[in-house]
């Protein structure tokens, strides 16, 4: 799978406040705000965009592995999925600014799927896990959320740990 370079697409980035966390622009947002911003952008975008939910491991890996860091830098938005990242974000904020919230991948995904009611036509692509997990997840989402539309799913080959 090739990660597209979105830097030449004007407006590809998700409009939100960010702060630098070890060299990466991480969103200062809540799950609700981010899901609304992503849903609105998805409906107006002519191409897919990339969202990373970054915990401390992901950020640290991006710092120490330049190839991985380059992939992170090409994300349209990086959400703080882990309290150490949130704490670092909050240390970057000025006195009086609102505090950053954790925007975990699963919470964000569920909020986006729930938002299909407000944003009909929203489609979702599932990436990661094994094929059995993706099948079970897509089935559960279709059952729980009748408006859920699956654009596709991909289980990449993983290296052994």
What are these regions (language model features)?
Residues 2-102, 109:
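N-terminal nucleotide/polyanion-binding subdomain common to many enzyme families
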Residues 11, 88-161:
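Conserved beta-alpha
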């Amino acid at each position: 799978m090739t990660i597209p370079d979105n830097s030449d697409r004007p407006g590809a980035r998700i409009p939100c406040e960010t702060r630098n966390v070890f060299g990466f622009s991480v969103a200062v947002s809540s799950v609700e705000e981010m899901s609304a911003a992503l849903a609105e952008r998805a409906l107006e975008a002519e191409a897919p965009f990339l969202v990373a939910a970054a915990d401390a491991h992901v950020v640290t890996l991006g710092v120490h592995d330049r190839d991985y860091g380059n992939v992170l830098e090409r994300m349209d938005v990086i959400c703080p999925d882990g309290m150490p990242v949130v704490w670092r974000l909050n240390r970057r904020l000025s006195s009086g600014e609102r505090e950053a919230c954790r925007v975990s991948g699963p919470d964000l995904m569920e909020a986006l799927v729930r938002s299909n009611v407000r944003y009909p036509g929203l489609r979702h692509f599932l990436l990661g896990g094994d094929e059995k997990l993706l099948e079970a997840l897509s089935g559960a989402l279709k059952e729980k959320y009748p408006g859920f539309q699956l654009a596709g799913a991909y289980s990449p080959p993983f290296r052994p740990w």
